[in-house]
Curated annotation (Swiss-Prot):
Protein name: Nucleoid-associated protein Caur_0522
Residue stretches spanning the membrane: none
PANTHER family: NUCLEOID-ASSOCIATED PROTEIN YBAB
Species name: Chloroflexus aurantiacus (strain ATCC 29366 / DSM 635 / J-10-fl)
Record family assignment: Belongs to the YbaB/EbfC family.
C-alpha cells in the first residue's frame, strides 16, 4: 500500500468518524429511577437534554431522596450513552474498548 492509498484510507475513516459523531449527537438515550418517576434524556455525547420529575417524588421534607433518584437516573443515562458510543465506534476502532 502506498502513501496515497494510506491518505485516502485515513480521510475515509475521518469522514466515517465524523458521521458517527453526528449520529451520536442526534441519538437520545433515557435513564430512569424510582420506577420511572425521574427520567433523564441524554444524547450520545453524554450531554443532558432534559430531566422529567414526577410531582409525586417532590417532597420538601425529603430532598435527599430526590437528589439520590436524580443521581441514579443521570448515571443510568450516562452508562447507556457510553454503551451506545462504544457500539457505534466499534466498526471504526476494531473493537478496542475505552477509546470513547
Amino acid at each position: 500500500m502506498n502513501q496515497r492509498q494510506l491518505m485516502q484510507m485515513a480521510q475515509q475513516m475521518q469522514r466515517q468518524m465524523q458521521k458517527v459523531q453526528e449520529e451520536l449527537a442526534a441519538t437520545i438515550v433515557e435513564g430512569t429511577a424510582g420506577g420511572g418517576a425521574i427520567t433523564v434524556k441524554m444524547n450520545g455525547h453524554r450531554e443532558v437534554q432534559s430531566i422529567t420529575i414526577s410531582p409525586e417524588v417532590v417532597d420538601p421534607d425529603d430532598v435527599e431522596m430526590l437528589q439520590d433518584l436524580l443521581l441514579v437516573a443521570i448515571n443510568d443515562a450516562s452508562r447507556k450513552a457510553q454503551q451506545l458510543a462504544e457500539e457505534r465506534m466499534q466498526p471504526l476502532t476494531g473493537g478496542l474498548k475505552g477509546l470513547f
